[in-house]
Amino acid sequence: CDHHVPDDVLPPAVAILNAKRLDNTYPYTHLSGCGVGFKFMQAFAISNGIEFHHLIPLLDLVAVSIASDIVPIMGENRILAYYGLERLNRMPSSGLHSIIKICGLDKHNITIDDIVFKIGPRINAAGRMRMDEHDENAAPSGGHAAVNLLIEGNDKQAQEFCSIIDA
């Protein structure tokens, strides 16, 4: 999933999800990468009889993606950001809750600016950190720790991943 304009020649793949592809038929072309993934999951849910409420816990991540990717907050992004911020302020995922605490933010009053200037940079910086790829027993670091943080459901484990990316 991506939100950047793709190259003229696409790499071989089973699927390339990108709202800016020349052959795209989706009406809104400014979705963030995570927004594209969310819409894919929404279509999958509809096609497979899965109720939408199962996707609601993911909206906080979508809001973080919209703000961090600096995509226009209009149209569908505005709607996803609104409900994502609502989720982030009410019941954030364990990983985002840990980042909110590390940033010293009021967990019930997170704004898009907080994501752009405090939360997003921590996640993005972690993705640029290197880990020892030859040591399979090494603790996750860098991008691996950031991904693990964002998908972690256990608060204590999320705090450990958060301390790795905040180091």
Named regions from a protein language model:
Residues D8-V9, P72:
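Proline-centered turn/helix-capping motifs that create local helix->coil transitions or kinks
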Residues V9-P11, S141:
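Histidine/acidic-residue-rich catalytic or RNA/ligand-binding cores of hydrolases
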Residues P11-I50, L55-S68:
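Short alpha-helices
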Residues C1-H3, S68:
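Active-site flanking residues adjacent to catalytic metal/cofactor-binding acidic residues
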Residues H3-P6, K20-L22:
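Short, ordered loop/turn segments at secondary-structure junctions
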Residues I46-A167:
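Hydrophobic helix-and-loop "lid/oligomerization" segment in the mid-to-C-terminal part
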